[in-house]
């Protein structure tokens, strides 16, 4: 039976790409579109909504969310409360918010996914970086995105850092008497290492994890050159969350 999908944020770049992915899969049905800036009432016969409250009682299985950090938490909570399994690519969630949504999903016995990155290569980078940090504990993360991205550092960088923290012995890097002559020059501090954010036009989504040791170095890098790179992960998420009864944070839990 076809999985009925709502796409929230369909006017955006990621949302519009997700719409095309859903339309191109015979196992999925595009049930509704949501965006507060939409002027049209329907697109190719699919109803368009500007207020999520109008979707209460709507017949759908999955809520795909590519909106903005300011509304993503409320959208995800709304989806769970109304029986839609959320697949969320919007970043900016706090640990407390993720825990609240996980608890709500358990109460409702509804599956869900919040993923900082849907590209399979990016997930592999996270795993490889965590493994490497056991042997190269001195490291820095550099993430690079388009200049319209609102949050920094990226959710992918934060998730990578969290996975590294789980296995790396905590240590403070750099000189003890290190001094920034320009505030922020060393980037954001996380568990003793640094995260740097680059925002430039022409970029999509890129990340490096640079490791240093005596006499050697190791660099891991992933590049998304086009948003289509995320769609295999979104597709997987849609098809997996309907089988589950709890929300998870990170696509790696579904691989």
Curated annotation (Swiss-Prot):
Membrane-spanning segments: none
Predominant place of localization: cytoplasm
Keyword NADP part of the UniProt annotation: yes
Keyword list, A-Z: Amino-acid biosynthesis, Cytoplasm, Diaminopimelate biosynthesis, Lysine biosynthesis, NAD, NADP, Oxidoreductase
Catalytic activity: (S)-2,3,4,5-tetrahydrodipicolinate + NAD(+) + H2O = (2S,4S)-4-hydroxy-2,3,4,5-tetrahydrodipicolinate + NADH + H(+); (S)-2,3,4,5-tetrahydrodipicolinate + NADP(+) + H2O = (2S,4S)-4-hydroxy-2,3,4,5-tetrahydrodipicolinate + NADPH + H(+)
InterPro entries listed in its UniProt record: DapB_C (IPR022663), DapB_N (IPR000846), DapB_N_CS (IPR022664), DHDPR_bac (IPR023940), NAD(P)-bd_dom_sf (IPR036291)
Active site: 145, 149
Example GO molecular function: oxidoreductase activity, acting on CH or CH2 groups, NAD or NADP as acceptor
Pfam families: DapB_C, DapB_N
E.C. no: 1.17.1.8
Pathways involved: Amino-acid biosynthesis; L-lysine biosynthesis via DAP pathway; (S)-tetrahydrodipicolinate from L-aspartate: step 4/4
UniProt xrefs under PANTHER family: 4-HYDROXY-TETRAHYDRODIPICOLINATE REDUCTASE 1, CHLOROPLASTIC-RELATED, DIHYDRODIPICOLINATE REDUCTASE
Full protein name: 4-hydroxy-tetrahydrodipicolinate reductase
Subcellular location: Cytoplasm
Species in which this protein is naturally found: Streptococcus thermophilus (strain ATCC BAA-250 / LMG 18311)
One of the GO BP terms on file: lysine biosynthetic process via diaminopimelate
Lineage start: Bacteria, Bacillati, Bacillota, Bacilli, Lactobacillales
């Amino acid at each position: 039976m076809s999985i009925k999908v709502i796409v929230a944020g369909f006017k955006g770049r990621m949302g519009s790409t997700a719409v095309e992915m859903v339309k191109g899969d015979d196992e999925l049905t595009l049930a509704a579109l949501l965006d507060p800036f939409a002027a049209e009432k329907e697109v190719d016969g699919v109803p368009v909504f500007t207020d999520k409250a109008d979707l209460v009682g709507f017949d759908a299985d999955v809520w795909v969310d590519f909106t903005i950090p300011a509304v993503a938490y409320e959208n995800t909570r709304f989806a769970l409360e109304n029986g839609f399994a959320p697949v969320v690519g919007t970043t900016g969630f706090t640990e407390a918010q993720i825990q609240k949504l996980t608890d709500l999903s358990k109460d409702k016995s509804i599956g869900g996914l919040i993923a900082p990155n849907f590209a399979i290569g990016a997930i592999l980078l996270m795993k490889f970086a965590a493994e490497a940090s056991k042997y190269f504990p001195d490291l820095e993360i550099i993430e690079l995105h388009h200049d319209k991205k609102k949050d920094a550092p990226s959710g992918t960088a934060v998730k990578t850092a969290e996975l590294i923290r789980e296995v790396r012995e905590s240590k403070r890097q750099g000189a003890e008497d290190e001094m920034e002559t320009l505030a922020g020059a060393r980037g954001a501090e996380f568990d003793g290492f640094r995260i740097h954010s680059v925002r430039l036009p022409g970029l999509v989504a890129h990340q490096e994890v640079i490791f240093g040791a005596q006499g050697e170095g190791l660099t891991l890098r992933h590049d998304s050159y086009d948003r289509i790179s995320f769609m295999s992960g979104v597709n997987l998420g849609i098809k997996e969350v309907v089988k589950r009864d709890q929300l998870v944070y990170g696509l790696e839990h579904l691989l």
